């Protein structure tokens, strides 16, 4: 009852957008493009869902999502850290191509260039209502914020929750100060780590934000957005703050999971997904909505219940081993995606850009290079082999350095030593076959060098306020 009441209080913020166009857009009823809900967690490991084999974390709603849709075994984030991964997702490009190779901080003056065409830009251009609710992390200055990158509305934190605040941030007149903070103290004191602002659109509305409330606040905001835009196609991008450290969970979930504090955060995320799915059903939008759940990269290598698990993969966040970039991914679209199906083909987050644009009827930009490929036929359950697969390779960047390449089952990694693995037989990357297959190593090395050279020759600038 409390959640429903809170949703009603939030709903007025979205109502004007939904109602003012409902009559015009009602002609789409029965033949409109699908709603798209894209949920992305922060630093969630490959194993950290029941449907991916977690021995201790319970995720009944996400497990049901897997049973009702498709589970991906070989889905890759665009990078092994936050900002580059998000840039890849929203532009359909390897992050080096758009010059977002590393994590952005409150002190930085750069962000995703306003001239980049984002997924939200494309969907907005064909009539979608768009909202970003959660962690942005592609630049916190006004020209880089979601409202300048194709989103009608934004609620969330501008970067990671272990950061600080930029004292130059625009403050709302009704900003809520917490922990004894005030405008004067914010300007006179050194920024405090883990104290981050909560923003609505382009203004700070709470500082420091109460991180124990974020998952539930994002969920309420998402539900209100869905309610207000039920009569038109909508794109809900929900990049959750959790389970990035410092971990936080509401009192209801704190201490509940056998997976420790980290498990608490995942189980609260799962409950939030359950509420969103329930609301879709209540609004009679299940058949009209594609729901996607994934993570921005692999988990932190942390103990004491604060880090996730990438097992059976090797590696963690920051690394180009599989555990750093292969992430869980679930998709459901009743009547289109076969229920209870599994996709074991290579798919990457940058493929969502052309795939979702195609579903929405949006034209891809022709004045720039994209790296994503349309994988709609895979979502429909298509079976491909040999040269017919939509994607047969993937490149693993670490910063500006191209460290690895996958081609089919083979993966070449060039870091401190030359490593060659057959992922089909050796998912844990434990048996180095480089000396056994020197010709394969050389062919893949040449392919890596050629791709990297071409990419950097055609890369586009990041945005800068200087």
Regions from the PLM with identified roles:
Residues 2-3, 7, 25-418, 423-454, ...:
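Formylglycine-dependent sulfatase
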Residues 11-26:
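Bacterial N-terminal signal peptides
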């Amino acid at each position: 009852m409390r959640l429903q009441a809170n949703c009603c209080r939030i709903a007025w913020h979205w109502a004007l957008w939904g109602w003012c166009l409902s009559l015009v857009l009602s002609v789409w009823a029965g033949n409109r493009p699908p709603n798209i809900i894209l949920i992305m967690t922060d630093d969630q490991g490959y194993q950290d869902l029941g449907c991916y084999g977690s021995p201790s974390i319970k995720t009944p709603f996400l497990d049901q999502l897997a049973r009702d849709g498709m589970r991906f075994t070989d889905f890759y984030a665009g990078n092994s850290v936050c900002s580059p991964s998000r840039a890849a997702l929203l532009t359909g490009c390897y992050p080096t191509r758009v010059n977002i190779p590393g994590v952005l901080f409150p002190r930085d003056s750069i962000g995703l260039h306003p001239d980049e065409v984002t997924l939200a830009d494309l969907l907005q251009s064909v009539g979608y209502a768009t909202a970003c609710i959660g962690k942005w992390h592609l630049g916190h200055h006004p020209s880089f914020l979601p409202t300048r990158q194709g989103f009608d509305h934004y609620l969330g934190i501008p970067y990671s929750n272990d950061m600080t605040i930029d004292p130059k941030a625009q403050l709302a007149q009704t900003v809520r100060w917490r922990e004894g903070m005030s405008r004067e103290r914010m300007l006179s004191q050194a920024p405090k780590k883990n104290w981050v602002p909560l923003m609505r659109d382009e203004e700070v509305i709470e500082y420091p934000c109460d991180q124990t409330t974020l998952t539930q606040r994002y969920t309420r905001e998402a539900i209100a957005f869905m309610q207000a835009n039920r009569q038109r196609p909508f794109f809900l991008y929900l990049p959750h703050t959790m389970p990035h450290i410092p971990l936080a969970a509401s009192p209801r979930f704190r201490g509940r999971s056998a997976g420790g504090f980290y498990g608490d955060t995942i189980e609260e995320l799962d409950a939030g997904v359950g509420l969103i799915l329930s609301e879709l059903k209540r609004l009679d939008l299940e058949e009209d909505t594609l729901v996607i759940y994934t993570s921005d990269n692999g988990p932190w290598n942390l103990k004491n219940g604060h880090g996730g698990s990438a097992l059976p993969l090797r590696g963690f966040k920051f690394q180009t081993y599989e555990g750093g970039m292969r992430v869980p991914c679930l998709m459901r679209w009743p009547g289109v995606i076969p229920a209870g199906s599994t996709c074991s083909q290579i798919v990457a987050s940058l493929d969502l850009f052309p795939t979702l644009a195609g579903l929405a009827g949006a034209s891809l930009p022709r004045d720039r290079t994209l790296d994503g490929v349309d994988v709609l036929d895979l979502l429909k359950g298509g079976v491909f082999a040999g040269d017919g697969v939509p994607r047969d390779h993937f490149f693993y960047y670490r910063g500006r350095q191209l460290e690895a390449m996958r081609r089919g089952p083979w993966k070449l990694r060039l870091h401190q030593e030359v490593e060659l693995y057959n992922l089909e037989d050796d998912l844990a990357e434990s048996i180095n076959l480089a000396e056994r297959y020197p010709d394969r190593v050389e062919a893949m090395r040449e392919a890596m060098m050629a791709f990297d050279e071409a990419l950097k020759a055609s890369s586009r600038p990041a945005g800068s306020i200087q």
